[in-house]
């Protein structure tokens, strides 16, 4: 599920970056700085997803109920932390972008990519990774149920 969210984040960011470059909004090219931007996005996205998944893991033994309810409560518990860290990161990267916009240097593209990546990563850690986890877990449980039924026959 985390890999699904990670691929989502990278592809959406890459798409926005391609649109911005094509429309001459920013200057960016494949360079070490752009690779660093995507590695930053990957790290940020994984960290956010791990925080949510860790809370789900902590809540599963403590809470009774459907997995969907546990996931929902876990997202609600981590929501403030996720939003605060995202806003803090966005503020600093937005300042970096504002200071470099129009300069046509590598930091302009870096800041733009990280801004898009942080926004998309924050969204996906809650609304892509968690539903994907639920879907994968339900499939796993259904397969385990089918295997038990086949064994009993």
Please name every model-derived segment:
Residues 5, 9, 41-44, 48, ...:
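Membrane-embedded alpha-helical bundles that form the substrate/pore pathway
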Residues 131-153:
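Interfacial helix-loop-helix hairpins and adjacent transmembrane helices
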Residues 32, 37, 65-72, 144-145:
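Active-site-proximal inter-transmembrane loops
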Residues 1-57, 98-99:
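Hydrophobic transmembrane alpha-helices and their membrane-interface caps
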Residues 27, 84-137:
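Hydrophobic, glycine/alanine-rich multi-pass transmembrane helices and their short helix-loop junctions
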Residues 63-83:
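Helix-loop junctions and hydrophobic alpha-helical segments within the transmembrane domains
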Residues 1-5, 71-78, 149-153:
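Membrane-interface segments at loop-to-transmembrane junctions
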